[in-house]
A protein has these predicted regions:
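Extended beta-strand/beta-hairpin segments
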Residues: 1-49, 59-154
Length: 154
């Protein structure tokens, strides 16, 4: 529901714009600024926003066919922990959905769909939360250019 169900790769490119400031851009040109500093979401907050946004889209697309919400908020929370080896990660991730619809037949129909849609998003459709819950390897490669001489980093 939240994404087209084709198996095509997804990608974004990150560019540094200043110390601690970055822009992520997708192939279509959409972009978001983030980093460390006033007015910027941190990478951890972007992860929380991605989880909330993925499920929000699933719920919004379906309920909006019946009725336009008068309120639609999703709060994503998590506890950042420091493991014994010094590594950081989040645990206890949680989404809280706050929706309201008009008090008419269409609004009541949309309101009645929300719990089922949230469950379906969590269990089946939200690629972001399902990836986090199931875990996946994050690989990397490095290419460094020093004084104009390109080469692979050791």
């Amino acid at each position: 529901m939240s994404e087209i169900n084709d198996p095509a790769p997804r990608s974004v490119e990150l560019t540094r714009t200043a110390t601690g400031h970055y822009t992520a851009r997708n192939a279509e040109g959409a972009e978001i600024a983030f980093g460390r500093g006033e007015g910027l979401l941190s990478p951890v907050e972007l992860l929380l926003a991605a989880i909330a946004g993925c499920s929000a889209i699933d719920v919004d697309v379906a309920t909006s066919r019946s009725s336009e919400p008068s309120e639609f908020r999703v709060e994503a929370t998590g506890q950042k922990i420091l493991e014994e080896n010094g590594a950081n990660r989040l645990e206890d991730l949680h989404l809280s959905f706050h929706l309201a619809f008009p008090d008419d037949a269409a609004g009541r129909k949309a309101a009645g769909m929300v719990q089922r849609l949230v469950t379906l998003s969590h269990d089946k459709y939200c690629t972001v939360s399902r990836t986090v819950e199931h875990g996946t390897a994050v690989g990397h490669d490095v290419s460094v250019d020093v004084d104009g001489a390109a080469g692979e980093a050791p």
